[in-house]
From Swiss-Prot:
This is Hemoglobin subunit alpha. GO terms for cellular component: haptoglobin-hemoglobin complex; hemoglobin complex. GO terms for molecular function: heme binding; iron ion binding; oxygen binding; oxygen carrier activity. The modification N-acetylserine is found at residue 2. O2 binds at residue 60. Involved in oxygen transport from gills to the various peripheral tissues. Heme b binds at residue 89. InterPro entries: Globin, Globin-like_sf, Globin/Proto, Hemoglobin_a-typ, Hemoglobin_oxygen_transport, Hemoglobin_pi. Red blood cells. It comes from Danio rerio.
Amino acid sequence: MSLSDTDKAVVKAIWAKISPKADEIGAEALARMLTVYPQTKTYFSHWADLSPGSGPVKKHGKTIMGAVGEAISKIDDLVGGLAALSELHAFKLRVDPANFKILSHNVIVVIAMLFPADFTPEVHVSVDKFFNNLALALSEKYR
């Protein structure tokens, strides 16, 4: 599903609004994923504390949202822009690519919770399309 110019503009606009809370969004989304989808904990078994609000969860949530921000800056070429990150997850971390969609869903849930007035149905559609394209780009090296 390709992103229209309107989708790209909407994603950039909502990112401008939410980016000051990106670290909080990332930490909450990761904590939700680890709670709701406990099978994802296997990728983080080296962390001593996987509980919501723990240092490792907050730190990785910040990393995740930093990557989302980077993806938005490369929105016209997600596959090329995220090639190194795709390679890392495919060959070194060996993350099942299905987890990209799981995490994306949780990020969307948190954005909707924290920004209910801004997260209109139109924004939801564009953000959902963006995260689907992001997940596909991150899955590129798995093929």
